[in-house]
Amino acid sequence: MSSRNASIANERTDEARMFNFYEKMPKDTNTVRVFDRGEFYVAIGEDASFVAQNAYHTTSVLKHHNVSNTSYCNLSPSLFIKFAEDVLSNLAKRVEIWGANSAKTGFELLKQASPGNMQMLEDLLVSENYQESTAISDSSVSSVLLAVTTRVKQDQRIIGVAFIDPILKKLGVSEFVDSDAYTNFEALIVQVGAKECIISQSGHESTNGNSAVSINTAEINRLRNIIEGCGALVTTIRSSEFSARDVELELSKVLDSPVTHALVPELGLQLAMASCNALLRYLGPALLNPDMEDDRENTSRKLHLYHHNLEQYMRLDIAAVRSLNLLPPPNGNAHKTMSLYGLLNHCRTAMGARNLRRWIVQPLLDAKSIERRHDLVSALVEDAEARQLLLDDDHLLRSIPDIPKLCRRLTRGSASLEDVVRIYQMAKALPKIVTVLDSLTSEHKDLVDKVYTNVLNNHCKNLEKLIELVETTIDLEALDSHQYIIRAEFDEELLDLRQRLDELQHSIFEEHKRVGSDLHQDTEKKLHLEQHHLYGWCLRLTRTEAGCLRGRSSHYTELSTQKNGVYFTTKRLHSLNNSYMDHQKSYRYHQNGLAREVIKIAATYGPPLEAIGQVIAHLDVILSFAHASTVAVIPYVRPNIVDSSIAQEKHGQSSNILDIVSLEDTPNFEEIRRTLENNHCARLYLKQARHPCLEAQDDVKFIPNDVNLEHGSSELLIITGPNMGGKSTYIRQVGVITVMAQIGCPVPCEVADLDIIDAILARVGASDSQLKGISTFMAEMLETATILRAATPRSLIIIDELGRGTSTTDGFGLAWAITEHIVTQIGCFCLFATHYHEMTKLSEEITTVKNLHVTAYVGDSESKDVALLYNVCEGASDRSFGIHVAKLAHFPPKIIEMASNKAAELEAEDSGAQGDTQEVKSKKEGMAIVRDIMRQWRSNVKPEMTQQQMMDQFQKVIGSFAQQINSNNWLQSRVSTNEVSS
């Protein structure tokens, strides 16, 4: 057997072994497995189908193994990287790479990654998607990993949480009391953007000091349901991992400061520390920095621990995030205008885009912090020239790399000279950015200087030595040819090697000319000198011209014949090439050593670089707000934040717990929350409000409407009107505008007066959960119950079409009771869109309930054409438009006619229920008489009777009921003794 045949046979044997191995692997729907085959990857079975649908978007790529008939498909390395990033970032699944073991007798797990733990694939993903300045997408979201445990003691449910953001190098902990619906935990998942959550495999003992409290499996299942509902991946680990024992030792390995109870008060949060221990153990001893064990003194590699306070941000449940379209869907296929994030994302840096996403799910509660953001936005709105320079100049924000990810590469030891050059280019761009900011003439110039200009100026000075280092060591002229190399003049030995390489290259060029003269071939057009990836320096002639080599094998050695010509060399060129390759190898080796030293020095600039990244990310979002406000169909306006109740006199020092670390003072959030909870919202007034996403869509002319919610007069608005008339849009735009105002963005209104809202809770749309055994109605009730428990007097509740999943009477009764409870017991602002017109009667009983309706024009009685006007007016809707909407949807005329007739019949019955007319009453009595006649006749008829005898018997019964028949008008007009006898 030839070596080629043997190789093919071995490959087939290995392939069969791979398919057999896959069949025996345990199935996991949350994991995608691929096999590394060297030059490509292979997905098998269900994983192949998943790859075909999500990577290729077609099943035509599926093949079938000729022995097992199992489906499979191949992926190139570049396609696999894109696919893996999508799976980890958007599809909430794990990725495993399997390959042949060292003995080549089986397969082993080579690498694995999950949405919250990408460390094994991180370098691969970053290197493939390195152009951060242009790759601003949802894939730039931080892969936040969270661990959670809980205990119930004295009827209080306490949650302990720890989470890590590897990009920002932050380790957050939190411990709080929650309801049995886990509303606070859900809000925290939304706030931190957790992609993966670690829970116990089963109920476990949670340590709190010296006591242990049992946690039953039901609590674990509730946590799982909340996590999965938020779109995060659930990972289970042994319950014994959730222990606070030795947590100080574990933290000392990864934190950037000493770990003692005096310096780290978070150690007193026992449940949070138990979750923290589980988190650290899951990630492994070296955490996200593999070399940390060898460099414990390097604090730039370590994490910053902070206490995440739920009280600092508006609470948003996942239903509100989705129903208000605050973020794009996980698949990322939606148009930019389909979500608030997409609409506002004009960021020029990846870290700015991440910061924007964080701000949207973390609206502020402190009025001063909100006003500060609006001041900064106003400064850029007022100066169009400066704004456009920052947006469009390729040498300003567009030249800033993804600094957190770049710093992470530096600290991991996986950086390159290209990374150092990008830092250098950023350092050169900073003074230009400062110059533009310094040119602003706004009344808020002092604030701009405090937040941006002065800070960036200081950091520019810190980077002067780094700029000098790069200009001294790196060949900047070579950047034009995309080469990142050390300057030969920087090192004497390197310079000697460079000079020798230049001499060899000159000799090679001379040999090229000599061969051209010898073969009588033009060295510019026919005889080509090339650096081949296999042969190094060699010569090439087209196959047409290669005839001149025949009979001259003693002078010229043919290397190969290919489509583009014949490759050959000479003895001298071969010798020169070998010498060149040896010197080049020495040059690269020596240069790599110098490059490592340069990179190591650059890595020491981690802290100032990270601080610059925070400032630039903040500026990028503020700039994005200003740009979105000015390019909108109708420019946005600055809202007036009505500070009705928040006490702001006492402010603490900055403690790095805000997303804009050290850029804004940190208010006393506990005081703010207490004040919020004890006070009602004063007002939410929007004049000519518009939905920002809808008005930005093509071919949409949006009809603006006013919104007026005021404590003591109009706290709950009931909106009725035709389907497709704009009810849902009206109530959702209020939620979106509220979020925009509290993140510091101007809003799409003419005038906006808003008090601080502490939570937006939404119950919008029907959502069957049949896979979980939950019906539409049950889902409605569960969501509504959660809202009622979580709402405070300062919340905003948005309810759309509650009670459709059950009978009309039950649905109406529940809707009435729920609405009445909200307005009388909770007292918060609420927008309630409903198809139950009877709900409008609630305003007659409760003065703070107001009725609104969306208008429609109805034609004359013959045409009955309907035109939806989308205006929201005071008062209740006086009719239903369901059949008219069916006409707009082009239902068959026969169905429309049947629906109209049935509606008329039901209306008649309904009016009868309200108070029967004489005709309807006569009909009911007549029908009862007929039933009595038939009942008596049947009892008198015998089986042996003839037909005539039966008719005679019927006449007798009719005669006995003659008085009742004659006294009933409806029966008398339809039945007579003569008609019956005939």
Swiss-Prot record:
It is found in: Nucleus. InterPro entries: DNA_mismatch_repair_Msh2 (IPR011184), DNA_mismatch_repair_MutS-lik_N (IPR007695), DNA_mismatch_repair_MutS_C (IPR000432), DNA_mismatch_repair_MutS_clamp (IPR007861), DNA_mismatch_repair_MutS_core (IPR007696), DNA_mismatch_repair_MutS_N (IPR016151), DNA_mismatch_repair_MutS_sf (IPR036187), DNA_mmatch_repair_MutS_con_dom (IPR007860). Its main location: nucleus. One of its GO terms (cellular component) is MutSalpha complex. Coiled coil: none annotated. GO terms for biological process: gene conversion at mating-type locus; maintenance of DNA repeat elements; mismatch repair; mitotic recombination. ATP binds at G721, P722, N723, M724, G725, G726, K727, S728. GO terms for molecular function: ATP binding; ATP hydrolysis activity; ATP-dependent DNA damage sensor activity; double-strand/single-strand DNA junction binding; four-way junction DNA binding; mismatched DNA binding; Y-form DNA binding. SMART domains: MUTSac (SM00534), MUTSd (SM00533). Keywords: ATP-binding, DNA damage, DNA repair, DNA-binding, Nucleotide-binding, Nucleus. Heterodimer of msh2 and msh6. Belongs to the DNA mismatch repair MutS family. Involved in post-replicative DNA-mismatch repair. Binds to mismatch-containing DNA. Required for correct termination of copy synthesis during mating-type switching. Also required for proper chromosome organization during meiosis. This is DNA mismatch repair protein msh2. It comes from Schizosaccharomyces pombe (strain 972 / ATCC 24843). The lineage of its organism: Eukaryota, Fungi, Dikarya, Ascomycota, Taphrinomycotina.
